[in-house]
Amino acid sequence: MLVFQMRYQMRYVDKTSTVLKQTKKSDYADK
């Protein structure tokens, strides 16, 4: 259970980090 939770958290962090990068790129593109 704990290992699965950690794996899920890491995957979630990966998603958020990629989304943040995408939004940053779009922000720069807008400017």
From Swiss-Prot:
GO BP field: response to antibiotic
This protein's encoding gene: ermC
Keywords: Antibiotic resistance, Leader peptide
InterPro entries according to UniProt: ErmCL
Function: This peptide is involved in the control mechanism of the synthesis of the erythromycin resistance protein.
Taxonomic path: Bacteria, Pseudomonadati, Pseudomonadota, Gammaproteobacteria, Enterobacterales
Name of this protein: 23S rRNA methylase leader peptide
